[in-house]
Each structure stands twice: as C-alpha cells, then as structure tokens.
Amino acid sequence: MVMTSPTRKPSGDVRPDEPLHHLDQPFREFLDGLPADRPPWFCFFSSGLLHVLHHFLRFTPERLNCVFICSGLSKEEAELRDRMSGGRPVFDMTEQVGSHEIFELLVRNLDRPFGIVDVDCFVTETDWFERCMDGLEPGVAVSGPLSYGPIPLAAPPFLALDPRVRPDIERAIGGTVTPAAYSYTAPGPEKEIDGAMVRLIEPHHERALARVVALEGPRLPFPQGGLVDVLDDGREVRSHERYHHLQNGNEVIRVVFDGLMFYQLMALAAGLRIAHFHSFPGTKVFAPQLVHAGGISYWHRLRPSEIAAGINELPWAAHVDALLLEEFNRRADVPASYRTRGTRLAANLRRSMVDMAGLRDELRAKLDSSGVDVTDPRWAVVLG
C-alpha cells in the first residue's frame, strides 16, 4: 500500500529500548527554540573534528537552519566552535555516542521534516538543501542526492527525512523499527560499524525484508551498498566485495545493515518511496555540486584489514583530513591537542615518504578532474 499523508507522531514518542532517553526532555526543549519557518539541518560531530567544522562552515549558507549536535567536546573545543560558528544553535552532550544513536534521538523527538548533513560533506550548490527537502512529498520517507545500490536508497552523508511516517511504516510491517544498524545475530568482539550499537532483526523485519531484498542464502542478502559482511577471520568488508573474499576461502558469518539503510528498506516494504533529485552512486563523491571523501572521522583508527578493504577510497579522506588540519592549525586559538596531532601526522607522513606538498598536489588534481572549481576561495585556502 502507498501512504499519501503521514500519521502525526504522538508527542514525546516513548521507546524504552532506544538509548539517550535521559536527553529527550532537554532535547525537545532545545528543539522548541529553533526557528519554525525553516526545516532544521542537523550536523553531528565529536571531539577532534573542529578542523573539519572550520571548512564545513565555509559552505554553510547563512539562511540555512543549521543545528549542531556535539559529543564529548572539551570546554576549549566548545568555546572555539561557538566563536567559529557565529552562535548557530548547538546541543552538547557529554556522552561519547555514534551517529546511529543520534539518528534514533532525532527520529524519536522531531515531528517535522529535517535534514542530516555530515560535517565532512561540503555542499557547493546551496539550493540543494531546499531541493533535498522538497523531495519529501506525500508518500516519500527519505530524500537525497547520494544513492546506495543496487536498491536505490538515500545515503546518510546528505539527506532529508520525514519522521512522521514512522508510525505508518511500523503499522505496515507489524512491529517497531529504528534508524540504527541491524544484524541477524548479535555482534561479536569486532564491534561492526565503528563500534556502533547493533540491533537484532526480528521476525516482522524478516518478513518485510522478503518483499524488497533478494537473498543469496539463509540470512544472506544480495550485496547492497550500506551492507557490511563480517568474515570468518573477523574482517568487516563491503558486501560488494563478497565474491572476491569467497574465492579466497573466506566465509560470511554475519551481515550488518548500516544506520538508516535498514529503516529505508522497511519504508519501501511499507509502500513508501525514496526520492532522488540527483543520483550520485555511493557515498564517496567528488563533484561540482558537493565533495564528500567520507571516513574523515575514523580513517586513522582503522585496522590494516579494514584499510585493505577500502583502499581505493580511504586515501582521499586522509588527504582532506591532513590538509584541513594543517590549515586549521594556523589559527592562534587552536587547542593544543590539534597541534599535537598535527606534529604526529607530519612525522607519520615523513616515515611514509609523503609530504604535505604532495598531498596538496594530489588533492588539487583530484578535485580539478572531478569538475570542482579549485580557484573557489573556499578550496584555494586549503590547496594553496
């Protein structure tokens, strides 16, 4: 069945199995203070990413109702963030949490459409924020320009969603669903999806999945963007690489659906649609309209096996991270921890026979060949 209008969410949607419930009341009070004439766009980041925020703010339209949610920032970081952002609304939390918990907090507490944009997603076409939100027509659960495949799901670095449709989704599938990561079996010590909380797929989910996902075997969905295969040697790899690893003698012992992916599959099973006003494949994008290298917040923490699994993508995250940090550290008010990291990064680069000038030349060439205007002052200040 196709929904034509969402059922209004009850005030204070109570879901005791979701995390961060102690923040619901202060968060709703915070939401009440946001401008009501424009949909909010939430940008979540944690400690250690002010150099990325510094660049993100260059691409943030003045009129955009941009709202920051921050996890675990030091007092010095929070003060510098506020100086840089010019007083944009911020909701601070002391807890160290991941994006999946934030997705749940947002969908549980908002009763109007909102957007999500990663702090390392630099949107050049400022009208794309409006176009993304305009895609939320009746019968649409999520809208965005980046697409997982082969099932065309919107990718989390830049999307808009309508939380009011969740009751309709749950009624159609016969049970609850959240925008968290999901798996058929409990996670092992690997802590898939960067240590995020992983929820278990229940019978009503399996019945709904059967309507929209092809299976290669029992509890083994066909490879799909946003789906992670956990191998028998503990490695976590993209499902698109499955056949390569099977030919090498590995077995898939568990699959994990990344955050918001499973939620969108349940929306499709309920008869709702995913809207795309543009169609970038995947989440790593270098294009005139936006740049999202992806993985900036965690590439340096990856194990060698994880680096090997994404070797064609992660180096660009390293380029962007290093160059943004170098430029940020020119400020006089940078916290000492950022200068320390800059010193360590420079030493690591020397050991790898790489220098900043080389990274700068490579990133400039990558951006230029992708149609990005490298003379744009926002990029020129980083590229030199």
Swiss-Prot record:
It is an enzyme of class 2 (transferase). Keywords: Antibiotic biosynthesis, Glycosyltransferase, Streptomycin biosynthesis, Transferase. Pathway: Antibiotic biosynthesis; streptomycin biosynthesis. GO terms for biological process: streptomycin biosynthetic process. Its EC number is 2.4.2.27. It catalyses: dTDP-L-dihydrostreptose + streptidine 6-phosphate = O-(1->4)-alpha-L-dihydrostreptosyl-streptidine 6-phosphate + dTDP + H(+). Coiled coil: none annotated. One of its GO terms (molecular function) is dTDP-dihydrostreptose-streptidine-6-phosphate dihydrostreptosyltransferase activity. It comes from the Bacteria. Is probably a dihydrostreptosyl glycosyltransferase, involved in the first glycosylation step condensing streptidine-6-phosphate and dihydrostreptose. This is dTDP-dihydrostreptose--streptidine-6-phosphate dihydrostreptosyltransferase.
